[in-house]
């Protein structure tokens, strides 16, 4: 019965935008930030590597490879700070952000985890001197924690910070990413967001990370990058 209740809750809310975005009227530079698909790392030239690379995994039901909520909020703030000196990359196929993988033991599919790992590896091989930061929202947090925890030390060292919104394995992982420094991890979990406390019940609080993804999280990532 609990599974059915959770499944129905997920289905009912899947079509809703996970977070209402709150961005300024886009300038010429910021226009690209509103795109739900970002492949700067994949398409970028190694001879023109930026100082910063953001890798993000969207929530279940979100479009593109970035979504149009937490991912674009974080990207917009970082691009305002670093202007043309940052690449933004979403985690795409085979991560399709479907609902059912939330019920898997890892909280997502192995294919999704492997694709995120491929992005971190690509950043390390293509732009080894860039500061890499990452983030995930809802199911995207499961994609990120699994990928980051499985990366070799050299790749983990390049990752300066990871932000997680509505962390679906927050309780199970005790508010951290296993085998990754706690000082490089920042978890944003609203007090009434049930997914942060060992369930998959979606309450309104799960969709209320606009301020965190627009201000608190990018500011923390900027500090992490500057301190590296």
Curated annotation (Swiss-Prot):
GO terms for cellular component: extracellular region. Disulfide bonds join 49-127, 189-196. The 2 disulfide bonds play a critical role in holding the catalytic residues in juxta-position; reduction of the disulfide bridges results in the complete inactivation of the enzyme. The record marks 60, 139 as: Transition state stabilizer. It is found in: Secreted. Residues 1-16 form the signal peptide. It catalyses: cutin + H2O = cutin monomers. Keywords: Disulfide bond, Glycoprotein, Hydrolase, Secreted, Serine esterase, Signal, Virulence. Glycans are attached at residue 190. This is Cutinase CUT1. It comes from Pyricularia oryzae (strain 70-15 / ATCC MYA-4617 / FGSC 8958). The lineage of its organism: Eukaryota, Fungi, Dikarya, Ascomycota, Pezizomycotina.
């Amino acid at each position: 019965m609990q599974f059915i209740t959770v499944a129905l809750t997920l289905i009912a809310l899947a079509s809703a935008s996970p977070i209402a975005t709150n961005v300024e009227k886009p300038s010429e530079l910021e226009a690209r930030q509103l795109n739900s698909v970002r492949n700067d790392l994949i398409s970028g030239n190694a001879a023109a590597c930026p100082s910063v690379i953001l890798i993000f995994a969207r929530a279940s039901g979100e479009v593109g490879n970035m979504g149009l909520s937490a991912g674009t909020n974080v990207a917009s703030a970082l691009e305002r700070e670093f202007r043309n000196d940052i690449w933004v990359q979403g985690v795409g196929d085979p991560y399709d952000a479907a609902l059912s993988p939330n019920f898997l033991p890892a909280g997502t599919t192995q294919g999704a985890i492997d694709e995120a790992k491929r992005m971190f590896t690509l950043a390390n091989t293509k732009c080894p001197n860039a500061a890499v930061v990452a983030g995930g929202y809802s199911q995207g947090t499961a994609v990120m924690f699994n990928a980051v925890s499985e990366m070799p030390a050299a790749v983990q060292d390049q990752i300066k910070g990871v932000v997680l919104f509505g962390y679906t394995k927050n309780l199970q992982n005790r508010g951290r990413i296993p085998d990754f420094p706690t000082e490089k991890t920042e978890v944003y979990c609203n007090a009434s967001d049930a997914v942060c406390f060992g369930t998959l019940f979606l309450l309104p609080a799960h969709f209320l990370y606009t301020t965190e993804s627009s201000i608190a999280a990018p500011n923390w990532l900027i500090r992490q990058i500057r301190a590296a």
